[in-house]
């Protein structure tokens, strides 16, 4: 299997195993699905952290309003009584007024937090450091774990306007957000290797040959952004080791130069009493008894 190290810019994303015979069209779809799936899990986990702390999201027309304003406008959250966490709730006010403040109990909160940690670990960038490939099945597994945890804590479900439910139902609205800018739609997705775009009509073997043991770095990006920066000749870690090597060598040369500067003191011509001993005929006298 060919192993691809997928990057976005200079940032490592994940490892992916495939075959040299795979059409680039199919490869782009697979890698883009995993890339966007990992982003979705990050967004869900971010919202689940808020859910664990402050409860469900209020309706859009009530978000950001003070309690007095809500009372004055006679607004009511119809979902507050329906979507009650299992085991009761603990009130923890959301200072930004986005969630209703009825947080799950500590035991249910731990269920959400533990599941978030497990899901993020499954598709983490650290998997690449551990030489573990990420698959679309792993992304789906992580999503299912998160969905299951939410169902345990909120057996009656979440409001239709809650971002977590919208993510699970693929109805999320990311327009105008930073998270939306990170997403790469499949038709706009490109893969680059060695300064070349992998054309969708070709096969991977047209670029890397037929050796199934090949390892390459590919970069994913949106169409129209030009060629991404090529990989440096040596890695950052190798560069650090090289700099340390040259530093040690430089210190060794400095020490040698210092030793050479004082080595003349041991020379015969530098001995101020040498000429005197020659005239007195006492040069090279050995005091050791025979």
Swiss-Prot record:
Pfam families: CFAP298
Alphabetical list of InterPro entries matching this protein: CFAP298
Disruption phenotype: Morpholino knockdown of the protein results in loss of cilia-driven fluid flow along the anterior-posterior axis. Multiciliated cells show loss of coordinated cilium polarity with many cilia pointing towards the anterior instead of the posterior. The planar cell polarity (PCP) component prickle2 is uniformly distributed around the cell margin, instead of being asymmetrically localized to the posterior of the cell.
Compartments, record wording: Cytoplasm; Cytoplasm, Cytoskeleton, Cilium basal body
Cytoplasm among keywords: yes
GO terms for cellular component: cilium; cytoplasm; cytoskeleton
Keywords of this entry: Cell projection, Cilium, Cytoplasm, Cytoskeleton
Transmembrane intervals: none
GO biological process, one term: regulation of cilium movement
Classification via PANTHER family: CILIA- AND FLAGELLA-ASSOCIATED PROTEIN 298 (PTHR13238:SF0), PROTEIN C21ORF59 (PTHR13238)
Sequence similarity: Belongs to the CFAP298 family.
Primary role: Plays a role in motile cilium function, possibly by acting on outer dynein arm assembly. Seems to be important for initiation rather than maintenance of cilium motility. Required for correct positioning of the cilium at the apical cell surface, suggesting an additional role in the planar cell polarity (PCP) pathway. May suppress canonical Wnt signaling activity.
Protein name, per record: Cilia- and flagella-associated protein 298-A
Source species taxonomy: Eukaryota, Metazoa, Chordata, Craniata, Vertebrata
Gene transcribed to yield this protein: cfap298-a
